[in-house]
């Protein structure tokens, strides 16, 4: 009836009905809505206090903490209160106390933003995520990392090898609470399975995006190999990290899609700003800057410092002030 409120409690589980009932009993059976709301508020206040800011307006602080909240939604806990979870082999496993199983690693979205941040403010979460990816690769017997994990699935969504970046970044920041040798071997396996090895680049379709992102991931493996004292591996992966050069057409002065036979894809009139021209959710003008691991090499390839400054100036000068989706600096998307 009008003015009445209905309070409903629900127990859920990723494992089974018994797990849902147990989760319900342990977490909310004896609590009312106000109690659950307050506990949730307290938990979020605790998590958001990992970063404290000063200055600015109240609106700006709201924007900041809302954004920080968004970085903490996933990867989410995948276990029941009793520690059981579904593993990469689709069987029920029990936590061994070393980590909390988590799910939803949207790799392409998060390796260059969310995870470097979380590695600094919430290393336990990053450790959980890496252990979850490692055990999934182990339990499934695939022995390589998924780029976009969802409920233990190897979805293959998007591109690149983002887990290799997350692993290397975490290791360099002192997050090493996992089987390091196994983690490293799975990184090597991932690069061999998905990478630029065959031709020195990845051919069409989306050849610019694939090649540049694989090259960066290989450089990450090189960094990890060097830190682990694997010098020969480090040299090999540093060389693989230079694969981005194979996508640069000196005649056109920019990165250009390439076919499997080595030929260049036809160059349209608006080649630099044509979306999906060798790139995923972007264009060559945007994706071409993705050489974070070798900026000096990129600058040399592009014609030197002055040429790069001119290109960057043009990129930002043509970016709309509202920062909405556009053909230049597209802050609204990942590349």
Protein language model features and the residues they cover:
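Tryptophan-centered motif/residue detector
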Residues: 44, 69, 108, 147-149, ...
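Acidic/polar, glycine-enriched structural segments that form the non-catalytic walls/loops
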Residues: 1-101, 135, 142-143, 181
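Long, structured ligand/cofactor-binding scaffold of large enzymes
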Residues: 89-91, 97-107, 111-112, 118, ...
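Active-site core of glycosidic bond-cleaving carbohydrate-active enzymes
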Residues: 97-115, 120-122, 160, 164, ...
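Generic detector of well-ordered alpha-helical segments enriched in charged/polar residues
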Residues: 21-26, 34-45, 49, 65, ...
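Carboxylate/His-rich catalytic cores and anion/metal-binding grooves
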Residues: 56-81, 117-136, 154-185, 245
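Short, glycine/acidic-rich hinge or "gate" loops at secondary-structure transitions
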Residues: 80, 84-86, 128-135, 143-150, ...
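Intrinsically disordered or highly flexible coil/loop and linker segments, enriched in small
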Residues: 5, 15-20, 49-57, 73-81, ...
């Amino acid at each position: 009836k009008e003015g009445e409120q209905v309070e409903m409690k629900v127990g859920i589980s990723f494992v089974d009905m018994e797990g849902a009932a147990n989760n319900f009993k342990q977490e909310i059976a004896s609590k009312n809505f106000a109690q659950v709301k307050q506990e949730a508020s307290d938990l979020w206040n605790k998590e958001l206090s990992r970063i404290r800011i000063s200055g600015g307006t109240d609106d700006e602080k709201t924007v900041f903490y809302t954004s920080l909240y968004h970085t903490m939604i996933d990867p989410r806990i995948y276990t029941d209160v009793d520690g059981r979870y579904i593993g990469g082999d689709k069987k029920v496993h029990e936590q061994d106390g070393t980590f909390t199983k988590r799910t939803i690693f949207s790799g392409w979205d998060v390796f260059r933003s969310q995870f470097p941040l979380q590695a600094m403010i919430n290393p336990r979460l990053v450790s959980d995520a890496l252990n979850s990816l490692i055990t999934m690769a182990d339990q499934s017997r695939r022995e390589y990392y998924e780029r976009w994990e969802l409920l233990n699935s190897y979805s293959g969504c998007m591109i690149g090898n983002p887990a290799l970046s997350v692993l290397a970044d975490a290791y360099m920041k002192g997050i090493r609470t996992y089987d390091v040798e196994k983690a490293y071997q799975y990184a090597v396996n991932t690069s061999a399975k998905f990478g630029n090895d065959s031709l020195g680049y990845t051919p069409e379709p989306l050849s610019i995006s694939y090649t540049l992102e694989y090259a960066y991931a290989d450089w990450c493996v090189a960094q990890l190999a060097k830190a682990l004292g694997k010098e020969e591996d480090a040299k090999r992966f540093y060389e693989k990290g230079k694969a981005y050069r194979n996508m640069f057409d000196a005649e056109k002065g920019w990165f250009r899609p390439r076919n499997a036979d080595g030929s260049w894809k036809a160059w349209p009139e608006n080649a630099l700003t044509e979306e999906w021209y060798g790139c995923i959710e972007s264009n060559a003008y945007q994706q071409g800057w993705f050489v974070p691991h070798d900026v000096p090499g990129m600058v040399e390839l592009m014609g030197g410092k002055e040429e790069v400054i001119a290109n960057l100036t043009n990129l930002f000068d043509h970016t709309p002030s509202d920062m909405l989706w556009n053909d230049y600096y597209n802050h609204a998307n990942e590349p």
